[in-house]
Amino acid sequence: MRVGLYPGTFDPVTNGHLDIIGRAVKLVDKLVIGVAINIGKGPLFSLEERVEILERETAHLKKIAEIEVRPFDSLLMHFARDVNAQMIVRGLRAVADFEYEFQMTAMNQQLDREIETVFLMADPRHQAIASRLVKEIATLGGDIGKFVPPGVAQQLLAKVGKG
């Protein structure tokens, strides 16, 4: 069984994340979406909310491949081994992403050479989307409808007191 791991904080999940997930499920038999606890980033959504949102927003993809949404707070490569992943899936939006991901991949290869990293280029419609910016736009009362699914927009606007 080909198992891929798509890790992230997903605070909130965006249309860009969902595009990568929708393409990644076509490459594997099972995709584990690893939700990083990452308290250092001070997430707006709780871990439970992020897991629930991802389960809801990816439910329609389960007919393509098995999908499992799991939180993790360990080293990524340890988590990848725990879920028997042969590959880590990462999305690239811009050159800055590539530089960071290149460095992370080099370090991860030192930790486990058996686990490959696969990069998927962001769809041009989603290249500018970043969770941090979506939260900022929502907080300032802007329209986030192009950046996140309707259910996520509703939850985010409620969180920032605009819904």
Curated annotation (Swiss-Prot):
Cellular component GO terms, alphabetical: cytoplasm
Biological or metabolic pathway of the protein: Cofactor biosynthesis; coenzyme A biosynthesis; CoA from (R)-pantothenate: step 4/5
Record's keyword annotation contains Cell wall biogenesis/degradation: no
The family this protein is said to belong to: Belongs to the bacterial CoaD family.
Protein name as annotated: Phosphopantetheine adenylyltransferase
Species of the source: Caulobacter vibrioides (strain NA1000 / CB15N)
Chain positions of site Transition state stabilizer: 17
MF term (GO), any: pantetheine-phosphate adenylyltransferase activity
EC number(s) reported in the record: 2.7.7.3
NCBIfam families: coaD_prev_kdtB, cyt_tran_rel
GO biological process: coenzyme A biosynthetic process
